[in-house]
Curated annotation (Swiss-Prot):
Induction: Expression is induced during conidiation, after conidiophore stalks had formed and had begun to vesiculate. Positively regulated by abaA. Negatively regulated by velC. Expression is also controlled by acoD.
InterPro entries: Znf_C2H2_sf, Znf_C2H2_type
Disordered: annotated span: 22-72, 238-260, 388-432
Record's GO cellular component terms: nucleus
The protein's name: C2H2 type master regulator of conidiophore development brlA
Role description: BrlA, abaA and wetA are pivotal regulators of conidiophore development and conidium maturation. They act individually and together to regulate their own expression and that of numerous other sporulation-specific genes. Binds promoters of target genes at brlA response elements (BREs) containing the conserved sequence 5'-(C/A)(A/G)AGGG(G/A)-3'. Controls the expression of the conidiophore-specific phenol oxidase ivoB. Controls the expression of the hydrophobin rodA.
GO BP, sorted A to Z: autolysis; conidium formation; positive regulation of conidium formation; regulation of secondary metabolite biosynthetic process; regulation of sterigmatocystin biosynthetic process; regulation of transcription by RNA polymerase II; response to starvation; sporocarp development involved in asexual reproduction
Length: 432
């Protein structure tokens, strides 16, 4: 190494401009931006206390770290090596084949970089080899405990998984890939970020689960001695209750533990007063009592309805009753009562015409039932009449005359004509 007496001895740059045109070789003595030059530029790590902004023509002193140059006519992309890496960790990023407009500046993602420096770009084909020597450059305090990241050998970053920087609780912005960022989070917001926003960026081991917080960390949550010690009454609490769930205070706020008493008495969540209570939430405390009272009322009314005096009359009081002593006949219509009264009278005008029967009925319908049930069946006690049997070929309900011994009609005869051989037969002889 050279003596570190002057900046020109410490930062000596050799640029091979033989393969470049006159317009493509920048002058290192003049200030230029790496954005405008296709020539690869040196890459280094700057911290807030060890290095200053790399103005190429006027930079600060580097007391412990120097840049070595490789003698010869090699190109600049292989001429720089950082001779001060204190650890054995390597830094490899899939930044090779990205277009110029797709590249993002490194200071936007690494808080260890100075925001005032000129934006440096990772060269597309630079080997990025470093010497791991004992004398090294101390890391910034916000960038400690970085694990080793494997170098991406494939130049096409689109076909490889993005290399993620290690997760850290001090700077949540470093937990995401620097190339696949849906949105940027400035590093200055890391100190003011609440615990709710910190949880997605933390490791499983570093994150604090809400159910594992010790009671001593949250603070005592003890109910008051009585309900009268509440700062507000229950009705006031229901009036100030919002219609939608309230986001509870974050764990990272400095207001202290979030307890149910603090929500009741106000505090950081006093904006709930702006909400109007909904009818469903307002009646939530009275609904169970109201439903219980309705159930009790229904039970009482059902018991009262089962009592005999409260039961409705199944048989309605009819207007037409039979006046015969000992008869409890009741009827809905007057004609029904008249028909019933004929059964009590001694007059029976309806007589069976079948020879040998001569049974009389007070009602015609009873006589017809007698014909159907008595004389139309074979083998009965009464005489069988074929003209009254619907299944017989001699069926004729209008026939009135003499019958043969087997019950078949004798056409042309009359009821008054004597039956042949009837003198030798009795009434029991008709029974078969």
């Amino acid at each position: 190494m050279r003596n570190q007496s002057s900046l020109s001895d410490r930062l000596t740059v050799e640029v091979d401009c033989s393969s470049l045109g006159s317009n493509e070789c920048p002058s290192m003595t003049s200030s230029f931006s790496p954005l405008e030059s296709p020539t690869p530029t040196p890459t280094s790590i700057y911290s807030q206390g060890s290095l200053e902004s790399p103005g190429w023509h006027g930079a600060g002193s580097l007391p412990n770290n120097t840049y070595e140059r490789t003698p010869g006519s090699a190109s600049m992309r292989s001429a720089f090596r950082l001779a001060g890496m204190a650890s054995t960790e390597s830094l490899g990023l899939p930044y090779g084949s990205m277009e110029g407009q797709e590249r993002m500046p490194m200071p936007d993602f690494l808080s260890g970089y100075d925001e005032n420096i000129e934006q440096l770009w990772m060269p597309s084909e630079a080997p990025k080899s470093y010497d791991h020597v004992a004398q090294g450059l101390a890391y910034h305090q916000g960038m400690h405990q970085y694990p080793t990241m494997a170098r991406n050998t494939n130049n096409n970053y689109r076909h490889q998984a993005a290399a993620y920087l290690p997760e850290s609780t001090t700077n949540p912005c470093l937990s995401r890939s620097i190339f696949h960022q849906p949105e940027r989070v400035p590093s200055s917001m890391s100190s003011s970020m609440s615990m709710n926003n910190m949880l997605p960026w933390m490791n499983l081991g570093d994150s604090i689960a809400p159910q594992t917080i010790a009671p001593s960390q949250v603070g005592p949550v003890t109910p008051p001695p009585s309900y009268t010690d509440f700062p507000t009454s229950l009705s006031a609490f229901k009036q100030h209750s919002p219609t939608t769930p309230i986001r509870s205070c974050s764990l990272g706020t400095g207001s202290g533990a979030d307890t149910p008493l603090s929500r009741l008495s106000g505090g950081p969540c006093e904006y709930m007063d702006d909400f109007q209570p909904s009818p469903v939430y307002r009646d939530g405390f009275q609904r169970p009592h109201r439903v219980a009272s309705r159930k009790m009322l229904r039970r009482q009314t059902s018991k009262q309805n089962l009592m005999l005096e409260n039961l409705p009359q199944v048989i309605k009081q009819v207007q037409f009753k039979c006046k015969e002593p000992g008869c409890n006949g009741r009827f809905k219509r007057q004609e029904h009562l008249k028909r019933h009264m004929k059964s009590h009278s001694k007059e029976k005008p309806h007589v069976c015409w079948v020879p040998g029967c001569h049974r009389a009925f007070s009602r015609s319908d009873n006589l017809n039932a007698h014909y159907t049930k008595t004389h139309s069946k074979r083998g009965g006690r009464n005489r069988y009449v074929a003209t009254l049997d619907e299944n017989s070929p001699d069926y004729d309900p209008e026939f009135r005359g003499q019958l043969t011994p087997d019950g078949r009609p004798i056409y042309g005869s009359k009821l008054d004509d004597p039956i042949p051989g009837a003198g030798d037969m009795s009434l029991d002889g008709w029974d078969e």
